[in-house]
C-alpha cells in the first residue's frame, strides 16, 4: 500500500515529486474513505499523532521500519504547506 511505498522512500527529500505524489495518493484515498472534500486538517492531525503519540509512532515504525512515523509526519506537512 501507500504507507509501504512511503516507508521505502524514507530518507528521500519530503519535497521531492515522488514523495509528494504518494502523499497525493494518500490524500485522494482519505477523501474517499472519510467521504470528505478536504482532508487537510484531518491529515495534519494524523501527522501530529505519528510524531507525538508514542503508541502510534511505535506501531507505524514496528510495521514499516524505524523512523517511518516521523518521516510520514514531515511528508504530510510538506504536502499541505
For every predicted segment, state its role.
Residues 1-81:
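Amphipathic alpha-helical "stalk" segments
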